[in-house]
Amino acid sequence: MSGFGSRAARPTASDDVCPCGGMPRGTALAACCGPLLAGERDADTAEALMRSRYTAYVLGDGDHLFRTWHPRTRTDDADPDDRVRWERLDVLDVIDGGADDAEGVVEFRARWVSADDGPLRRGELHERSRFVRRAGRWVYLGAE
């Protein structure tokens, strides 16, 4: 991973574990979130989309974040803050959001480190994210 102030490089080996931890755990990026970030396929579930969005934050992929954010709630600039390094994702709960659902909620905790012009800071984001299907595709609607 790159240092602060620059984008993290994408893992290049096909057997690199996905930054989301893999689903199932330990799955390689190429078999987990990689195809979603590349636009090769859509997420089957709300959890898969949430994991791919976390991976996009880790890898600095603002295009994926923008593409998977509901147009009614997204900002004009979806680029991740390159001063923040995301270190770990824990999925705490999933409500609906399956292949046959129209809505879903994924609760997660994501740990981060930042060196924002000062001493190293650590923190975590704890969120219950809402997802909906739009034109058959899962999109992030916002936090509850």
Predicted feature locations:
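Cysteine-rich micro-motifs
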Residues: 28-36
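Small disulfide-bonded, cysteine-rich extracellular recognition modules and tandem repeats
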Residues: 21-23, 35, 134
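Beta-strand-connecting loop/turn residues
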Residues: 16, 102, 136-137
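Short beta-strand edge/turn micro-motifs at domain boundaries
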Residues: 123-144
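Core segments of small alpha/beta cavity-forming domains
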Residues: 35-82
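Surface-exposed, charged secondary-structure patches
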Residues: 81-124
